[in-house]
């Protein structure tokens, strides 16, 4: 997801300030047929702890069905990538807390590089695995190659997903109203309107709302919401079929080097400025 200027400003609010940011409660849960998830042929899924962004909460619930090997799951609020240092500190602290566990073989991160917020993470006792992804959009599309191809074909697209829709964190009328309420806690009316206008100018760089889903219960109302936002903005609308394979294999394996980066204790995750997106390094280099 692209960083929002408004969200960067809101990050400057005092930590104890209530933003009263509304959620878009038009995405009810519905019954969906859960997939028959299983590990790769001939293998068993490794016992893992899962650290995940809550933007993927319903997708993970769907594709972890039957996953007794996932011993512990922790979800963190979406939008932490607006402050990459805070995301890194939060995840590193969670890794430290998982050190005491003797019943896991690895920690899986349902994140991408996320504004380099996961760069410099260091596993302490258990190896760490993360998909080779710029952000959650790569996870929805199923591969870094598909992400790169779509970015090339539609550089002016803005991505909508069920999770981002639920939190009103995508361009649209409810995002404007939620931002106005939050900014009013910190700034006077003139400054609020200036910041909102700056946000609208950022949105003007885009002309297409691209909606992605992985078959969760809120997929259809989420698509309708994205279409309504596109109409309000005067944008085109497209819906792409998501590919759950990257998320499924993060949860179940296999973790091949082409799609996943494994970081062993004594290593750290760093950004790679090529198609790999990320690599490992030691403190020596």
Regions found by a protein language model. Give the residues of each.
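N-terminal basic/disordered segments at the start of proteins
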Residues: 30-67
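Gly/Ser/Thr-rich loops at beta-strand to alpha-helix junctions
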Residues: 51-58, 80-81, 108-119, 134-135, ...
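A short beta-strand-loop structural module common to alpha/beta enzyme folds
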Residues: 70-84, 239-241
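Glycine-rich, highly charged phosphate/nucleotide-binding loops
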Residues: 84-98
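Extended, charge-rich low-complexity interaction segments
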Residues: 100-114, 119, 160-176, 262-285
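Long, charge-dense
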Residues: 126-172
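A conserved mid-domain beta-alpha-beta active-site/ligand-binding segment of alpha/beta enzyme cores
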Residues: 152-220
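Extended, basic/helix-rich recognition subdomains
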Residues: 194-285
């Amino acid at each position: 997801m692209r960083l929002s200027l408004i969200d960067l400003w809101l990050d400057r609010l005092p930590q104890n300030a209530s933003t009263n940011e509304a959620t878009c409660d038009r995405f009810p849960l519905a019954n969906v047929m859960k997939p028959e998830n299983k590990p790769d042929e001939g293998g068993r899924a490794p016992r893992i702890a899962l650290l995940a962004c809550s933007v993927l909460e319903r997708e993970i619930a769907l594709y972890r069905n039957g996953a007794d090997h996932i011993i512990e799951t922790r979800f963190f609020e979406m939008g932490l990538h607006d402050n990459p240092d805070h995301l890194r500190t939060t995840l590193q602290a969670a890794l430290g807390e998982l050190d005491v566990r003797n019943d896991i073989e690895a920690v899986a991160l349902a994140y991408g590089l996320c504004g380099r917020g996961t760069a410099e993470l260091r596993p302490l006792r258990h190896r760490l695995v993360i998909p080779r992804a710029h952000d959650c959009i790569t996870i929805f599309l199923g591969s870094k190659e598909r992400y790169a191809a779509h970015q090339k074909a539609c550089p002016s697209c803005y991505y909508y997903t069920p999770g981002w829709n639920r939190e009103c964190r995508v361009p649209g009328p409810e995002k404007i109203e939620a931002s106005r309420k939050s900014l009013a806690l910190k700034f006077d009316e003139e400054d609020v309107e200036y910041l909102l206008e700056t946000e609208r100018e950022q949105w003007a760089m885009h002309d297409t709302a691209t909606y992605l889903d992985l078959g969760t219960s809120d997929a259809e109302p989420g698509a309708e919401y994205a279409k309504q936002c596109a109409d309000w903005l005067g944008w085109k609308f497209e819906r792409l079929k998501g590919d759950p394979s990257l998320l499924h294999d993060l949860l179940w394996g296999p973790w091949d080097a082409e799609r996943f980066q494994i970081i062993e204790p004594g290593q750290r995750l760093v950004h790679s400025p090529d198609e790999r997106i990320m690599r490992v390094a030691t403190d020596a280099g």
